[in-house]
Amino acid sequence: MDLTVEPNLKSLITSSTHKWIFVGGKGGVGKTTSSCSIAIQMALAQPHKKFLLISTDPAHNLSDAFGEKFDKDARKVTGMDNLSCMEIDPSAALKDMNDMAVSSAGENGNDDLGGLLQGGALADLTGSIPGIDEALSFMEVMKHIKKQEQGDGESFDTVIFDTAPTGHTLRFLQLPTTLSKLLDKFSEITGRLGPMLNSMMGSGNVDIAGKLNELKANVETIKEQFTDPDLTTFVCVCISEFLSLYETERLIQELISYDMDVNSIIVNQLLFAEFDQEHNCKRCQSRWKMQKKYLDQIDELYEDFHVVKMPLCAGEIRGLNNLKKFSQFLFKEYDPVADNTVIYELEEKN
């Protein structure tokens, strides 16, 4: 029986069970291009389903990649009926939180608190907290789950995350466990001080314990889903260089410690110089020799992974048409001989 793992993402692209797909790795290795490519291929392969691509990276690139503006509200990609994008903007989300807090304080008769928050005090305070970007991204996941449970608003079959560089992503993935422990402590405190805390919130009879229990239930749901390999997977993105390979291994070990499924690696920016005599040069040959050395290590280390080898293109991979051309090699692996002309056929984008 042949146990060779296919060097493509066909099984993921055609998956009918996955709800959450994370795409991450070291900065500058092509995470955004890879996440856009996965989202496009899934949307093309499963036209009856809806897909959402979310950027959790503070330096948002989805708008640049597609050549159209996205913001904190999901909006369809022009030319794709079943693919939407959104970029989580921490400053806008914090302003919304502050406005909601002001409104809530006013409704509950707590004018002093409302006056304090009116100047954006909550946004200023929370904006300076380390990891606030990851927390806001996590809130979007919770909102999405709530919508699905309640059948409220537009829901999506699969959410693909274009994540921030490795450190931010690991903090994001730790949030379910961290929040779960934190909420346990809060529940303990509210059990003892509930009536006093409720009186401090004003006359609105806010059930703090009830809200905490509801939040904890949502967090536990996410925790369960993130550790279910049928529902969630992580796709690592790297280039064939020492530092990128080292960070990819560190990332994979961390993901395994979180019980998260990871079995795919996209290796970007490969030259395949020996197959391209027309555009060959000494620098390309030297670079390709170095790339091959680390590719061999990747193949040896991750023989049970889907290792997808993607070519370095002659132009920028921007705009839907260029992304479609590039992304086809996730579904059917790139052939340096047969597909060589494709990497020189990208449209120029202003």
UniProtKB/Swiss-Prot annotation:
BP terms from Gene Ontology: cellular response to oxidative stress; pheromone-dependent signal transduction involved in conjugation with cellular fusion; post-translational protein targeting to endoplasmic reticulum membrane; response to heat; response to metal ion; retrograde vesicle-mediated transport, Golgi to endoplasmic reticulum; tail-anchored membrane protein insertion into ER membrane
Cited InterPro entries: Anion-transp_ATPase-like_dom (IPR025723), ATPase_ArsA/GET3 (IPR016300), ATPase_ArsA/GET3_euk (IPR027542), P-loop_NTPase (IPR027417)
Cell compartments where the protein resides: Cytoplasm; Endoplasmic reticulum; Golgi apparatus
Residues of the active site: D57
Enzyme type, top EC level: hydrolase
Enzyme Commission (EC) number: 3.6.-.-
Residue ranges crossing the lipid bilayer per the database entry: none
Main location: cytoplasm
Annotated ATP binding sites: K26, G27, G28, V29, G30, K31, T32, T33, E241, N268
GO molecular function, one term: guanyl-nucleotide exchange factor activity
Function of the molecule: ATPase required for the post-translational delivery of tail-anchored (TA) proteins to the endoplasmic reticulum. Recognizes and selectively binds the transmembrane domain of TA proteins in the cytosol. This complex then targets to the endoplasmic reticulum by membrane-bound receptors GET1 and GET2, where the tail-anchored protein is released for insertion. This process is regulated by ATP binding and hydrolysis. ATP binding drives the homodimer towards the closed dimer state, facilitating recognition of newly synthesized TA membrane proteins. ATP hydrolysis is required for insertion.
NCBIfam families reported in the protein's UniProt record: GET3_arsA_TRC40 (TIGR00345)
Name of the protein in its database record: ATPase GET3
Species assigned in the record: Candida glabrata (strain ATCC 2001 / BCRC 20586 / JCM 3761 / NBRC 0622 / NRRL Y-65 / CBS 138) (Yeast)
Species classification: Eukaryota, Fungi, Dikarya, Ascomycota, Saccharomycotina
Gene that encodes the chain: GET3
